[in-house]
């Protein structure tokens, strides 16, 4: 290990001790549990579109076309099926994230693997799935599901979802921005 790597590790440890460590978890962490990456998810949506719409190359538009052509219920069922919700378990990375004792965890993932790991390790994190959860924070530690959650029925995946994000999630957006301004952010799985 070189001096820069050692310095970074010490910086992360110090931030954790001072309750200033935030871990931002991307889809790469869940792939180790068998969850497909973004491209594979979009490809599964594309396969069910009419031939004339399969030529679309913009991922957000593909998701939007699927949702618009199949309806919301079928869209959500397809996403849940593609992401194997309820059929997967946390992997060692999920537990390692918790071992770092971050004061907050931010994720763009829709799955509940982090929540499962939290429950198995008997740790307390208040899960924020929607703006209305923020005023009721019960614990110092939070898990912020920045792109929504299946249980809350508010995932962010389509073109319209991204376009309307600041209107649909203004408090979560502001909260995450405040964390970026005041904490050490460690990105994992991007």
Outline where the language-model segments fall.
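Conserved catalytic-core helix/loop/strand module for nucleotide-ribose chemistry
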Residues: 1-184, 188-190
């Amino acid at each position: 290990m070189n001096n820069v790597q050692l310095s970074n590790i010490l910086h992360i440890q110090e931030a954790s001790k001072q309750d200033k460590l935030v871990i931002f978890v991307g889809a790469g962490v869940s792939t180790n549990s068998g969850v497909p990456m973004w491209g594979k998810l979009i490809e599964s949506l594309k396969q069910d579109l009419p031939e004339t719409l399969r030529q679309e190359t913009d991922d957000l538009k593909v998701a939007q076309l699927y949702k618009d052509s199949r309806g919301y219920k079928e869209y959500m069922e397809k996403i849940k099926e593609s992401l194997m919700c309820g059929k997967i378990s946390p992997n060692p990375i999920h537990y390692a994230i918790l071992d770092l004792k971050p004061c907050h965890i931010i994720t763009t993932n829709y799955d509940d693997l982090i929540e499962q790991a939290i429950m198995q390790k008997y740790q307390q994190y208040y899960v924020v799935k929607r703006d209305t959860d923020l005023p009721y924070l019960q614990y110092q530690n939070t898990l912020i599901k920045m792109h929504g959650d299946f249980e809350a029925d508010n995932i962010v995946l389509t073109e319209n979802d991204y376009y309307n994000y600041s209107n649909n999630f203004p408090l979560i957006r502001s909260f995450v921005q405040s964390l970026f301004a005041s904490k050490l952010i460690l990105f994992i799985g991007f």
